[in-house]
């Protein structure tokens, strides 16, 4: 079974990486539809592989064993599953409370802000996709060795909808919500299957769909964010400590005063037949403040979008610190040192003031996935927290750092 676990994890994560590279650049409902389509296609594929038993599946799967001790009964596997759930929750909490986790949560409001802070939205989405595949592979392995049988049936589109309902009932974006939602939906499903045949003989299958649909509508009406966030609003908030002084984060090399930093040469940006930026050229040197002045609709915001990579110029060249950034991704331009603000506020309302400001330290920090998951990033995290607090205190918001934005 342990070789099977290794193969399941590596193959699933590899396939998820390939599928993610192919589909994660899609936006909105197109992304959701593509993942559903992949699920249907792969389920149909495995259901027609003769070596895997087609839709009849594979039977006589050996139980999970530790040496000579085998977990034969469901009760024995039950405790193993809860141990794994506890470990996943701990790792998930560590990850979401880290540099990468803040970037993941910030994606909930769109790509524009995160890209402007030096965060590659595509890479973070791909990371989330692979982590989800890793957990799915682990769950499938446990399911197969607990049931001693596996087939494509339990992984069809209907189960996908059920998993979505679990997430929404418990609270999407909440670790505890995933567990609570799974427990509620599973218990309700079992109760409905037990009692509906007594109420309506011969029509229990249709009534089960009606019952779950009614439940779904009620949650959308009264607890749209899910049970855990809904209940959390009425519970006393945990008091969080104030960040302690910590070493400063590393700074990039500073240019010499008067050195040429930014050169824009003949920049032009068109939207169909409309020329928003027409043959603009200027230089910006270190220590210099340059203002772009013009009436509404003159193209000022479009020019800034071109400078920061949110838009591409149709003609011309933009050079920063001796390197052309005309075709660079927005996140790479931000990492190079060009920052921006927005006319319309793009704060993340479900993150605290401190966490919102800490997003700005992403390009100056380096902690990766494993260190974040195991909380090996305490020194860097402390520096990022203290830097964010220092900036909040500059504008008089230090006492409200843990308030939601």
Model regions and ranges:
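Transmembrane alpha-helices and adjacent helix-loop boundaries
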Residues: 1-250
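The feature captures the beta-strand-to-loop junction immediately N-terminal to the Walker
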Residues: 290-295
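Helix-to-loop junction immediately C-terminal to a conserved catalytic motif
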Residues: 308
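Conserved ABC nucleotide-binding domain
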Residues: 326-327, 391-405
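Q-loop/switch helix immediately C-terminal to the Walker
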Residues: 344, 351-372
